[in-house]
Amino acid sequence: MKLCVVIVLLMLAMPFNGGEASRFFNQHARSQRSGMKTRGIWCDPPCPEGETCRGGECSDEFNGDMGR
């Protein structure tokens, strides 16, 4: 009898836990995807080889001012 009650309680708890977890993972995946997307459209057209993209502008200094 006790085992049956435990199983029912677990089944009742699962949708809430699963919903929370999936919401967290979806949010995480969404932020990862949007991060990739913004990184891709920073410089259009892409910078020539040897230059890095910073805030939409191409720069050939690898360790220049990060605060710009």
Curated annotation (Swiss-Prot):
Propeptide: 21-68
Lineage top rank: taxon: Eukaryota
MF terms (GO), sorted A to Z: ion channel regulator activity; toxin activity
Compartments where found: Secreted
Modification comment: Contains 2 disulfide bonds.
Annotated signal sequence range: 1-20
Keyword annotations: Amidation, Disulfide bond, Ion channel impairing toxin, Neurotoxin, Secreted, Signal, Toxin
Coiled-coil residue spans: none
Principal subcellular localisation of the protein: secreted
Keyword field contains Coiled coil: no
Tissue: Expressed by the venom duct.
Gene Ontology CC entries for this record: extracellular region
Modified residues (Methionine amide): 66
Reported function: Probable neurotoxin with unknown target. Possibly targets ion channels.
Domain notes: The cysteine framework is XIV (C-C-C-C).
Record-given protein name: Conotoxin Cal14.13b
Organism (species): Californiconus californicus
